[in-house]
Each structure stands twice: as C-alpha cells, then as structure tokens.
Design a protein with these regions (language model features):
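Substrate-binding cleft and catalytic face of glycoside hydrolase catalytic domains
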Residues: 1-146, 176, 219-224, 267-269, ...
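Aromatic-rich peripheral "rim/lid" segments of glycoside hydrolase catalytic domains that contact
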Residues: 12-17, 21, 82, 91, ...
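Non-transmembrane alpha-helical segments in soluble domains
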Residues: 34, 76-80, 120, 124, ...
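Noncatalytic carbohydrate-binding groove/subsite architecture in carbohydrate-active enzymes
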Residues: 69, 73, 107-238, 272, ...
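Structural motif
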Residues: 81-88, 160-161, 204-205, 252-256
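Core-facing hydrophobic residues within beta-strands of well-ordered domains
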Residues: 86-87, 166, 209, 258
C-alpha cells in the first residue's frame, strides 16, 4: 500500500513528513520500495487508499473516504507521476463493501464508483499505459447497508457506470474453513470458489475480456490453544503449507480469467500483534523464522516458471 495519509500528510500538496523531526520527504520510504523492486526485478501493485485527517472532516478514521474525491485523484496522480515507467499497476481502495474500510458508515457502491471513475480518468490522462485495478471486494452475505454482499455491490457498481473505469477486477481469495479444492458453489458459502459468482456478474455486464486478480489469498493458522477466536477460519500449519500451492495450481488449471494471486502476507514488523487472529496468516515470524508454508511456496515457485503479468 502507498497510503495517502503517509504521503500527503499534513495538508494538500505537502509531501514533507515532520511527524518525527527533522523533516524529510514523505516519498523516501516509497522511493526505497520502488528502488528495491527494480533491483530485484519485481513488479509492484500500488494500492492507493487511506485518507489523511485533513481530507476527511465528515467521517473519522483513515479508512474513511475523502470529503472531495478530486483530492484523492490528485494524490493518485502524484504517485503515478513520480513512479511513471516504474510502477504500472494501481489498485484503487480496498474492500469498500465493508464498512470497516469505508469509515465505519453505511457503504456506498455508487460513491465508490464515482471515486474510481474520477481517479481512473485522471490517471489514464497522465499515463495511458498504466493498469488500474478496482478495489478487492470482501466476501460477505450481509445486505444491511453497513456491509453489503459483494455480488450486489458489484452489480450496483456496473449500474453506476464502473465498466469504463477499471482494467482488472480484484477479489479476495480466502478459503476460511475449507481447502482450495472445495468446488461447492453456494452464494452463501465463503470458500475459494466464491469469486466465480463475481466472474458471472462481469460476463453478464460485458466484461468477460477483463481478468480477475486475487488481492489476498491464504488460510489462517491461528493455534488452537491461543485462546483467539477463529474469525478467518482455521487451518493447521501443515494444512496451510499444503493448501497455498494448491490454490495457485487450481487457478491455473480451472480459471483462465485469473491472473495474479497475492499471498497475504509475508511478515509483520514485530510481534506486538500476536494477540490478533489475523497475525497467523504470516509466512514468517518477525525475526524471519520461516513457517512451513514458506518452504512449500518456495518449492512450488521453483517448479513453475515465472511468467510476467500482462
């Protein structure tokens, strides 16, 4: 993520970070990320989201949408201009169909579509060669308004004109309680196959030519004796190590519309979040102690030649 609140911190057009004197460029961290990606031949997907305090007076929290979508588009343009020719892929927001990532207020598919379309138009004017990903939608069966089922949300995006405003669709690929070979298709079942319903909606709206990328994929290996609730399903470390490679294998064999699958995540900076269930998606501990899933994915990658994203 290239979070807005960490780049344009204290006011519009101010890219200085003075939170911890002496002041320095807020771009420094992200310049280093892009430099390292270049050095090691890696592609970067820059997720653009997380509103700074000065840009959100109506709703609190960094995940709230901005008061003015044009401010967000200006920040996105600044990122694209700075890394033109070096970063090609940009994801606009994350999980806007869940109120936790929309300012803890009722979600707004039409509002998100306006944000997406304004940003898409501005970015393509700067660099028509970039690739814009729509936000990954979180799987949910709720239709309360606070959280909105991703199938309903995506159709409302299309109804609001989103088809012209993204190049690739993003989804979340969590299996929760079942493995990657779970072929059940039930609109109220959250499993690794669930995105097929979103694919059907895309086809129905004339977007069969667009790829789907999985923004986050993994199984949660929270220890049974941790006392933590299995909010994201539960797998053993051995199951996690077996299932992650199978997730890539199944997508390659069965779903030609799937492109990139992002494993979430490698490691945290420290162990201060070990009391949070989501910590146990990790591939490595903060001290770089490797989990079995790391070795499993390393072996799988070694056996499957790398192919560059389109």
């Amino acid at each position: 993520e290239f979070p807005w609140y960490d780049i344009e911190i204290s006011g519009k057009g101010n890219f200085e970070d003075c939170r911890f004197p002496p002041c320095h460029s807020a771009w420094d961290k992200y310049d280093q990320i892009v430099d390292l990606a270049d050095k090691y031949g890696l592609e970067t997907i820059a997720r653009l989201s997380s509103t700074p305090e000065w840009a959100r007076t109506k709703v609190t929290g960094t995940f709230a949408p901005p008061d003015n979508y044009s401010d967000f588009a200006d920040y996105a343009v600044a990122v694209v201009e700075r890394y033109r020719g070096r970063v090609r892929y940009f994801q606009i927001w994350n999980e806007p169909n869940g109120n936790a990532e929309w300012g803890d207020q009722p979600v707004d598919p039409e509002g998100y579509t306006r944000l997406l379309c304004e940003t898409y138009t501005r970015l393509k004017a700067v660099d028509p060669d970039i690739v814009v990903l729509a936000a990954a939608l979180t799987p949910t069966n709720e239709v309360t308004g606070d959280n909105l089922n991703e199938f309903v949300y995506l159709q409302r995006m299309y109804d609001a004109g989103a088809a012209e405003c993204f190049d690739i669709m993003s989804v979340q690929g969590y299996g929760l309680w079942s493995g990657p070979t779970d072929h059940r298709l039930n609109p109220i079942t959250v499993n690794y196959s669930r995105h097929v319903y979103l694919r059907d909606i895309m086809v129905r709206n004339g977007d069969e030519h667009k790829a789907i990328w999985i923004s986050e994929m993994n199984w949660n290996a929270v220890p049974p004796d941790s006392g933590l609730p299995p909010n994201y399903g539960q797998a053993t470390l051995k199951q996690q190590a077996r299932w992650a490679p199978l997730a890539y294998e199944r997508a390659q064999k069965e779903w030609p519309w799937i492109g990139v699958i992002n494993f979430w995540f490698f490691k945290r900076a420290d162990d201060s979040e070990k009391n949070r269930t989501w910590y146990y998606f990790r591939m490595a501990e903060p001290d770089f102690t490797l989990m079995p899933v790391y070795e499993a994915m390393k072996a799988y990658i070694a056996a499957h030649p790398y192919s560059k994203a389109p």
